[in-house]
Every structure is written in structure tokens, then in C-alpha cells.
């Protein structure tokens, strides 16, 4: 199916198969499709609503077109789709260091802030990490620090064809949700935070169509794209060859007290950097530390390091209290800067 045929189909509200969506994405990412065709397709797809098959087909092509990071061993990604408007501090980024301190190899894929003041790239840069590394630089971080960061614009050169169109049409499109599915290090383990419950289910099924080994897709209480402390969280457990399993998990189920969402608010880069350092150094106790423990625990489970979230919380606590989480941050800073 070519993109003109796909536009006609989607305008008529017909869902594309995974193979058809992949074929269209191939045209977009090879520069064959015109800007007008890309804009029409993205808008029509958004209005129809993307299916898990369409998302998976497009993600598979975007993965292939990425600049790959090669690492000999399993890696996990912790990220969110963003767009929740909650303005929390950088929870998943902090949790990534805690997960690395517990023994996982974390290949984090992210960008600068889109809907918040301070995105993962912004806070890492503020902490002293050199974020614009090439594939070999990231691989070195994975080998020597147990955690690396792939700055999305550097690793998706084929996005240059769709990027200007996305900016010009100014609406959220399927590309806003493809980023977390297209890790250049081919992470087959993942924690994916999603701000919408309906989209969380859709992305769980999309991941089950890809080569995922184990992932947790999480939707926080109140519409947040990470596990939170204010109430029950929706989790989809995705394992290779199985339909996603849905569950509700409240903080007290894993031994953590509830806290209002306002207790997790972040600020500008300097403010968030101070929070991350205070948590990783063990100085901070309270809701901000607790929410990091919760989200790091999800990584332990998705990475098959912990059998359940309660055990994961205990492992996360030890990662911080032993100094290993902070050590991972300091190692990442040094390795990324060539020191």
C-alpha cells in the first residue's frame, strides 16, 4: 500500500494492517512521500485514532531506520510519552539511576522538554552529563557506567522528513507516541509511562506485537505518565508471546504511603537537578524518594531482576542507601565526558 492509498483508506475510517502501516512509514522515512502527503496522512490517522497494529507497524520501521547502539547484553529503557501536564520532577530519569545501581543496564532514550519545563535531556545536561554522544559513546557508557542516554534527534536521522511537517501542523500525532517505542539500543525490556488509560492499553498491545521480552506499561492515578502515590495505578504486564495482563496497584500494596500529586511537582532545570541529587545521595526522604522507589521497582520487575513490585521497592531502597545509584550517576558523567 502506498501513502496515497493509505490516506484514502484512513479518511474512510478503515484501519490499516500492521504491514500496510509499515509500508506507509517506509515511504515517509525514506523521503519518498511529499510533505503534503505526510501531513494529510498524520492528520487523518489522528482523527480516526491509531490502532495497536498501526503503531507497531510504524514503530518497526522507525526502529530499523534509527542509528543503532550496539551492546552485548540485555538493556532496559524507562520513559514516558509525556503530555500529562502534571509538571512532576524527572521521576523516570531518577529511577533509571536507581535501577542501574541495582544491576540493570539502562539505555535511556529521550529528548528535551516538550510539555514540561525540564525533560530528561535537560536534567541530565544540568547534572553534568554530555548528552549528545554518538552510538559508540553511548555504548561506552553502557559498558562502563551501566547506563547511557540516547538524545533522540541524534539517533533518528530519517525523522528529518516528518519533523518539519509535524511542527507546521501543530497537533499531536502518532509520532508523539512512537519515540518511546523506538529505542536505538533495541531495548527489549521497558517501563513505559502513558498519560491516558486507553492509550496505555493500546501501547501494551503494540509492544506485544514487537520483539518485547518483558515490559510494564503504566498509567498513574490522575492521568500521569508514571506510577504515582496518590491512588491506584493501572499497569499492563507485557511478556513475549502473551496477551498483556492488566492490574491495579496502589502504593500501599508495595509498602509505600500515599501522597498528593502536588508533593511531586518539579520546576526548572536547576530545581530538578537539586531534587535528583538529593534523592540519589540519600539525603531526601519522603514522597519524592518514595515515587522514585516505586518507578525503579517497576524497572526491576520489567527487567526480570525482581519477582514483584514490593521486592523491587526493597532493591531500589538498597540501591540508593548503598550509594550505588549515585555512583552510577557519577560514572555516567565521567564516561560521557571522556574522563
Swiss-Prot record:
Name of the molecule in the record: Anthranilate phosphoribosyltransferase
Domain of life: Bacteria
Residues the entry annotates as binding anthranilate 1: 80, 111
Family of this protein: Belongs to the anthranilate phosphoribosyltransferase family.
Pfam families in alphabetical order: Glycos_trans_3N (PF02885), Glycos_transf_3 (PF00591)
Function: Catalyzes the transfer of the phosphoribosyl group of 5-phosphorylribose-1-pyrophosphate (PRPP) to anthranilate to yield N-(5'-phosphoribosyl)-anthranilate (PRA).
Alphabetical keyword list: Amino-acid biosynthesis, Aromatic amino acid biosynthesis, Glycosyltransferase, Magnesium, Metal-binding, Transferase, Tryptophan biosynthesis
Molecular function per GO: anthranilate phosphoribosyltransferase activity; magnesium ion binding
Lineage, top ranks: Bacteria, Bacillati, Chloroflexota, Chloroflexia, Chloroflexales
UniProt-listed NCBIfam families: trpD
BP GO annotations: L-tryptophan biosynthetic process
Gene Ontology CC terms: cytosol
